Amino acid sequence: MNPFHDLEPGPDVPEVVYAIIEIPKGSRNKYELDKKTGLLKLDRVLYSPFFYPVDYGIIPRTWYEDDDPFDIMVIMREPVYPLTIIEARPIGLFKMIDSGDKDYKVLAVPVEDPYFKDWKDIDDVPKAFLDEIAHFFKRYKELQGKEIIVEGWEGAEAAKREILRAIEMYKEKFGKKE
């Protein structure tokens, strides 16, 4: 089984999507799901003394403008193991440009954690935490000499629109998967 191609994007898209976690919160290792094999590979170790502030992964059967699956960040109280599948509720959209490519990311919370039951939109997330995430992405490739432009945050509706668009982009690239 290849989780990228064989899982649906979610049980109730775009309200609830599957997040396949590649990188646990607190890691300096950047793992990526290999699109061909479905195995996890080490892409690189971050050059900076930074660590991922959230669990980070992809939404299956999506594709985005950076020529990769659509990224998703899941706010968890404890880090989860790579390749964990989380039913996640999109609450926001982080907008950034990475080396000239649009590289937007969904921000989500786990459906099955009562701690986040009232988090429905970006305004429910403490601003200080959003600032930490933005700071991480602004600086994490700096020592590699790559430029990141942070455009800011949008709410849940923008995230849901981009998820639906990323599903259509997947279908265009890989053909409709039944």
Curated annotation (Swiss-Prot):
Q: Which CDD domains does the protein's record reference?
A: pyrophosphatase
| Compartment annotation | Cytoplasm
Reported cofactor(s) = Mg(2+)
One Gene Ontology term, aspect cellular component:
cytoplasm
Presence of the UniProt keyword Magnesium in the record: yes
The UniProt keywords, alphabetically, are: Cytoplasm, Hydrolase, Magnesium, Metal-binding
| UniProt binding sites for Mg(2+) 1 | 66, 71, 103
The cross-references to SUPFAM superfamilies, in alphabetical order and at most eight, read: Inorganic pyrophosphatase
Which domain of life, per UniProt?
Archaea
Say where the protein is mainly found: cytoplasm
Residues given in the record as substrate binding sites: 30, 44, 56, 140
Q: Which residues bind Mg(2+) 2?
A: 71
Q: List the catalytic activities from the record.
A: diphosphate + H2O = 2 phosphate + H(+)
What EC number(s) would the UniProt record show? 3.6.1.1
Show the Gene3D superfamilies listed in the entry.
Inorganic pyrophosphatase
EC top class named in words: hydrolase
InterPro entries given in the database record? Pyrophosphatase, Pyrophosphatase_sf
Q: Which biological process terms from the Gene Ontology are attached to this UniProt entry? A: phosphate-containing compound metabolic process
Q: Name one GO molecular function term.
A: inorganic diphosphate phosphatase activity
The UniProt family comment states: Belongs to the PPase family.
Which PANTHER family does the record cross-reference, listed alphabetically? INORGANIC PYROPHOSPHATASE (PTHR10286)
Q: Whom does it interact with, and what assembly results?
A: Homohexamer.
Q: What does this protein do?
A: Catalyzes the hydrolysis of inorganic pyrophosphate (PPi) forming two phosphate ions.
- Report what the protein is called: Inorganic pyrophosphatase
Q: Which organism is it from?
A: Pyrococcus furiosus (strain ATCC 43587 / DSM 3638 / JCM 8422 / Vc1)
